[in-house]
Amino acid sequence: MVDNKQNVVAEFKLVLVGDGGVGKTTFVTRHQTGEFEKRYIATQGVNVSNMVLYTTKGPIRFNIWDTAGQEKLGGLREGYYIGANAAIMMFDVTSRITYKNIPKWHKDLTRICENIPIVLVGNKVDSKDRKVKARQITFHRKRSLQYYDVSAKSNYQYEKPFLWILRKLTGDPTLNLVEGIALVAPDTEHVMTEDQIKQLEMEQAEAMNLAQQGVLPDDEDDEFN
């Protein structure tokens, strides 16, 4: 079990942004009980989860800010963003509108936080009701952001956003985790099969190939709407 009171070599504020219901809180709380500390800051209307990751540079602490539903009230207070070292922007691949709102979240975020590492993640890729296909996800390419498919409930690619951010923040592209993140086991209905994972990887490879060829679909095309 991680001792959150221990000395760490670095500590960072990481903010989660995106529409309500996309799975931000589920994403944070996949850690097994005792692996993180959670506190509520009433003045900002946020939950902050304290998470320590063991890396090849030593233990590093993330203070992960989650909106606690405040995004449903028409936006977040500036204090939510101030002092952030990195961000994860999340949308739900089963909901087109949550992806269409990503530019708004990016604008709000970068207005306060310039030049911080930002990862865009498409959550719920375990769902058979996917609406936003890999080749339709183009915003990160236009803004030079990192993107990952994830599934909070199946733990698919859970560590990748954190590892990418850690490498950017430390300036060490070779940094790795020396211990895996302890996660709650996925429910049976959310366990992803090898075939599902292969299909996702194939679709991502196809999307990357199209991007390299300069063939990017328009977010406003008929198929997307």
UniProtKB/Swiss-Prot annotation:
Pfam families from the UniProt entry: Ras
A GO molecular function held by the record: GTP binding
GO cellular component, one term: cytoplasm
Xref: SUPFAM superfamilies: P-loop containing nucleoside triphosphate hydrolases
Keyword Protein transport in record: yes
Annotated ranges, domain Small GTPase Ran-type: 8-172
Switch-I: annotated span: 38-46
Cellular compartments annotated: Nucleus
Assigned keywords, A-Z: GTP-binding, Nucleotide-binding, Nucleus, Protein transport, Transport
Principal subcellular localization: nucleus
Quaternary organization: Monomer. Found in a nuclear export complex with RanGTP, exportin and pre-miRNA.
Protein known as: GTP-binding nuclear protein Ran
Source organism of the structure: Tetrahymena thermophila
